[in-house]
Structures are given as C-alpha cells and as structure tokens.
Amino acid sequence: MINMATITIDDDVYKELLKLKGRKSVSEFIKELLEERKRKNLDVFMIAFGSRSEEDVEKLKKELKEAEKWMQSLIQV
C-alpha cells in the first residue's frame, strides 16, 4: 500500500512544475529531483570526507540512511 499526501503550492509554481515535468507524473518528477539532490549531497560529502577510513565511511553511510528514514517518516505524517 502506498501512502499518499496532499500538498499545496502556489498556482505559478504549479504551472512551472507542469512545464518541467513533461510526461512524468508529479510524484515521479519530484522523486527524481530528490534523488538528484541526494547524489549531489553525496558528491559534496565525498569531497569533504573522502580521506576518511573505510570504517568511518560505512559508519557515516549508516547514520545517513537512518537520518533519511527519519526524514521520510516526517514526510509521511
């Protein structure tokens, strides 16, 4: 079962969103934007912490996944 939520955005923002999303659903488009942002954040993270040990990197990845789960739980409320 997929949880759904309703969001409210200004009309001008919605019109721009429709132009940008093309044939994708709004959900697909937003999901892609979020994935792109995650990738960019990971790139910055790797630049900043690339000299860490493999153990430190794995620990940080685990903490980031936990933070992401927590953030997702907030979105689903």
From Swiss-Prot:
Q: Which UniProt keywords apply?
A: Toxin-antitoxin system
Pfam families listed in its UniProt record: VAPB_antitox
- Organism equals Methanocaldococcus jannaschii (strain ATCC 43067 / DSM 2661 / JAL-1 / JCM 10045 / NBRC 100440)
**Tagged with keyword Isomerase:** no
Family label:
Belongs to the UPF0330 family.
The primary gene name is vapB3
Q: What is the name listed in the Swiss-Prot or TrEMBL entry for this protein? A: Putative antitoxin VapB3
InterPro entries on file: Put_antitoxin
On the tree of life, the source organism's domain of life is Archaea
What biological function has been recorded for the protein in this entry? Possibly the antitoxin component of a type II toxin-antitoxin (TA) system. Its cognate toxin is VapC3 (Potential).
